[in-house]
């Protein structure tokens, strides 16, 4: 059996070490072939970092890594692009000053790679200059991949003033991308939540949000068909070892770790939880341990009545699935964007206002919420 890629988000490492890779390159090919500036919001553990890593290898023209995958004989591998890959997990954002310095240090590393000298210490000017100069020096446009664009703001949200200051700095930094359009081939940003999206992306034109778009519902996460196909040997082994029918086992996996939807039609299994289950052969709560924060726990406890209604499967609605107000967080909206709730259906009131019915997707999430409330 091929190995499980638990915790690995580097595409090259997965391929070169013969780990299982669920082929998402058909969807990636369709996305990058037709769009310019895109964003994707999904909860932790759904494979956003792996998606960006895969895109990086495609744009850099590393064809040999894609042998046997959909994109192998579709993409024009003679076109190679310069990739700037910014991962906010590797950026220090404890204070606005540390955020600015860490981003500047990141730009210096990119500049050194292309033997480009930055001008002074102005962050945004240097970012703009760097993109332009890489294009001019190599005669190839630049691809910018940003992983966790919202992480500095979300992780600072317990301190509203700090979060607002960091948000302002990020807005200025990201605005450079709009001004650099003629030097760019493709821009892709991922995050955990659409919180404050309006502020961050108000400087952009035509940002394509594929989070709920009908063409790309399965770009992250596993469909049931994908899970059954790629992990059949593991499922079959567990089924025999535990003396449980395969179909019943798959149904249990869905009840525990599936049920995620961002359009009410296509449903996904949480990859991190599914990996952990296969590795341990035990139904348990895996995903939440890496998703909980003090802010989230306090938010749930401070809105215990609403959360208990969710746990009791009462109908619950969210009027806006996109933009959170930084100074007034709606608990259901925040839970939806962070993977604790899922979209059931979109509805329209008599006033024609759109609202959304939401629900707890699976046993793992319900168990997590119960544990928080019980403490």
Give residue ranges: language-model regions.
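Phosphate-binding site recognition
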Residues: 1-375
């Amino acid at each position: 059996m091929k190995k499980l890629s638990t915790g690995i988000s580097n595409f090259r490492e997965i391929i070169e070490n013969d780990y299982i890779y669920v082929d998402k390159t058909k969807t990636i090919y369709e996305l990058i072939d037709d769009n310019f500036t895109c964003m994707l919001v999904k909860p932790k553990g759904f494979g956003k970092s792996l998606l960006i890593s895969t895109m990086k290898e495609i744009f850099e023209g590393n064809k040999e890594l894609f042998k046997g995958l959909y994109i192998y004989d579709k993409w024009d591998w003679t076109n190679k692009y310069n990739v700037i890959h910014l991962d906010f997990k590797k950026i220090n954002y404890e204070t606005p000053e540390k955020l600015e310095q860490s981003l500047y240090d990141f730009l210096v590393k990119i500049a050194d790679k292309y033997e480009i000298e930055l001008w002074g210490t102005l962050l945004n000017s240097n970012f703009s200059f760097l993109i332009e100069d890489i294009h001019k020096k190599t005669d190839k446009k630049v691809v910018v991949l940003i992983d966790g664009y919202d992480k500095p703001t979300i992780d600072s949200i317990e301190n509203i003033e700090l979060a607002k200051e960091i948000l302002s700095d990020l807005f200025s930094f990201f605005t450079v991308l709009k001004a650099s359009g003629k030097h760019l081939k493709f821009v892709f940003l991922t995050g955990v939540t659409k919180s404050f999206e309006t502020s961050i992306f108000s400087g952009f034109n035509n940002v394509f949000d594929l989070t709920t778009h009908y063409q790309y519902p399965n770009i992250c996460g596993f469909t049931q068909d994908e899970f059954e196909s790629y992990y059949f040997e593991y499922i079959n082994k567990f089924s025999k070892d535990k003396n449980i029918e395969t179909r019943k086992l798959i149904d249990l996996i869905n009840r525990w770790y599936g049920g995620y939807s961002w359009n009410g039609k296509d449903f996904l299994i949480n990859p991190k939880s599914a990996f952990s289950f296969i590795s341990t052969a035990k139904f348990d709560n895996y995903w939440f341990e890496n998703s909980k924060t003090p802010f989230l726990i306090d938010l749930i406890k401070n809105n215990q009545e609403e959360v208990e209604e969710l746990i009791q499967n009462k109908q619950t609605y969210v009027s806006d699935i996109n933009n959170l107000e930084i100074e007034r967080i709606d608990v259901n909206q925040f839970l939806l964007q962070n993977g604790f709730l899922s979209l059931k259906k979109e509805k329209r009131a008599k006033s024609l206002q759109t609202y959304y019915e939401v629900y707890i997707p699976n046993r793992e999430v319900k168990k997590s919420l119960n544990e928080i409330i019980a403490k």
